[in-house]
Amino acid sequence: MTSYNFKTQTSFPLLLSISFFFLLLLNKVNSTGSLSFSFPKFAPNQPYLIFQRDALVTSTGVLQLTNVVNGVPSGKSLGRALYAAPFQIWDSTTGNVASFVTSFSFIIQAPNPTTTADGLAFFLAPVDTQPLDVGGMLGIFKDGYFNKSNQIVAVEFDTFSNIHFDPKGRHMGINVNSIVSIKTVPWNWTNGEVANVFISYEASTKSLTASLVYPSLETSFIVHAIVDVKDVLPEWVRFGFSATTGIDKGYVQTNDVLSWSFESNLPGGNSVASVKNAGLSTYAA
């Protein structure tokens, strides 16, 4: 288990203040392009989500990203769930960039807390994004090398330290075009506990911040980096979750998302494509 210093944690009330501040920023933007949704829980065959590989929604309304058989998580599993409508993250005509906030809750539970793998990520990628490698690649990368053509920004919640591209111990990280994070902080994962996550991107400062709170512990873990999404991402993207379990026997965990909300503003833009034209007939119930 990784040790922590005070700089990696902050109080729960402070986290709420940070969250409220970014919500105010979004509400003050005069914008014709916005996207807002909330899933307090999920529904099987959710019409506004694209499910890839092992991802599904259970009868209890949980977004189960990786495979579970008879209550036991499977190895070598990969699942992703994306918001179906393409999202305009920046405007090529005006040069404007969207600010956004997203929050979600998840549970990672492992039969053996000493052999967890591999993790869960929130990510933005090209509209035609498809699942890539299992295990440490978290389903969003195909190798450990930086590649500008990947056009991916992600926040990872990594439960297994891969020697070639991870820091020691479980960690949160911000990834730009590579599984090697540009910034990480140690993360004191708690087996089977609900984690509440808040991620914000402020376009004017290019500031990407992710916070994770275990409500029962009233502490949080925060990672922050400067990311120019206009330089990294295409104008239109899809976004959502990806998760994997380990390749080696016994290195498994559940990767379950309980709820999800998102809000964005793009000054002068469209922000989101018409749901009618987003290809939802393929995924609708």
UniProtKB/Swiss-Prot annotation:
Glycosylated position list: 147, 188
Summary of the tissues where the protein is detected: Strong expression in seed. Lower levels in the flower, and the bark of the roots. No expression in leaf. The lectin accumulates in the inner bark in autumn.
Binding site for Mn(2+): 156, 158, 166, 171
Pfam families xref list: Lectin_legB
Swiss-Prot/TrEMBL keywords: Calcium, Glycoprotein, Lectin, Manganese, Metal-binding, Signal
InterPro entries according to UniProt: ConA-like_dom_sf, L-lectin, Lectin_LegA_CS, Lectin_legB_Mn/Ca_BS, Legume_lectin_dom, Leguminous_Lectin
Annotated family: Belongs to the leguminous lectin family.
Name used for this protein in its record: Bark agglutinin I polypeptide A
UniProt cross-references to PANTHER family, sorted A to Z: CONCANAVALIN A-LIKE LECTIN FAMILY PROTEIN, LECTIN
Lineage of producing organism: Eukaryota, Viridiplantae, Streptophyta, Embryophyta, Tracheophyta
Function comment: N-acetyl-D-galactosamine specific lectin. Bark lectins are storage protein that probably maintains stocks of nitrogen during dormant period. Self-aggregatable molecules that can bind their own carbohydrate side chains. They could also play a role in the plant's defense against phytophagous invertebrates or herbivorous higher animals.
Signal sequence extent: 1-31
Organism: Robinia pseudoacacia (Black locust)
Binding residues for Ca(2+): 158, 160, 162, 166
PROSITE patterns to which the protein is assigned, alphabetical: LECTIN_LEGUME_ALPHA, LECTIN_LEGUME_BETA
Subunit structure: RPbAI is composed of two polypeptides, A and B, that associate into five different tetrameric isolectins. The A4 combination is the only one devoid of agglutination activity. Isoform B4 displays maximal agglutination activity.
